[in-house]
Amino acid sequence: MAGLPRRIIKETQRLLAEPVPGIKAEPDESNARYFHVVIAGPQDSPFEGGTFKLELFLPEEYPMAAPKVRFMTKIYHPNVDKLGRICLDILKDKWSPALQIRTVLLSIQALLSAPNPDDPLANDVAEQWKSNEAQAIETARAWTRLYAMNNI
């Protein structure tokens, strides 16, 4: 971890020493700014039972700039597009250097528990969520079974 800002070293040490329940985040062996993340689908959500792989990258400007995060596992969610990009205010205009990797991961986990079709990234999924929520939830469960189980 030579040459890394002290803050990144401290955050990484804390993530490894005190993992967030349901979330595993490990720095890549060759690049300590790149994290392999696995989030367990939250209980009582359409994603329950799934394990979702994400990648998180800390740009040179971090913590003045937000981490770059995306889902690697396909997910049927109104706030995640086909490329795995996530619509989350703290990853964009609401980012603050006071926030940490841990906060970002908790916010993504919360987004799985409470999809927000009113601020969509995947418009087709959001429309389905608004017009027929039961059907959208069933599709999300089916995608979870298909793409997020037995995938680790």
Swiss-Prot record:
One of its GO terms (cellular component) is cytosol. The keyword Magnesium does not apply. Its EC number is 2.3.2.23. Activity is inhibited by binding to OTUB1, which prevents 'Lys-63'-linked polyubiquitination. Activity is inhibited by GPS2, leading to prevent 'Lys-63'-linked polyubiquitination. The active site is at residue 87. Pathway: Protein modification; protein ubiquitination. It is an enzyme of class 2 (transferase). Conjugation to ISG15 impairs formation of the thioester bond with ubiquitin but not interaction with UBE2V2. Belongs to the ubiquitin-conjugating enzyme family. This is Ubiquitin-conjugating enzyme E2 N. It comes from Rattus norvegicus. The gene is Ube2n.
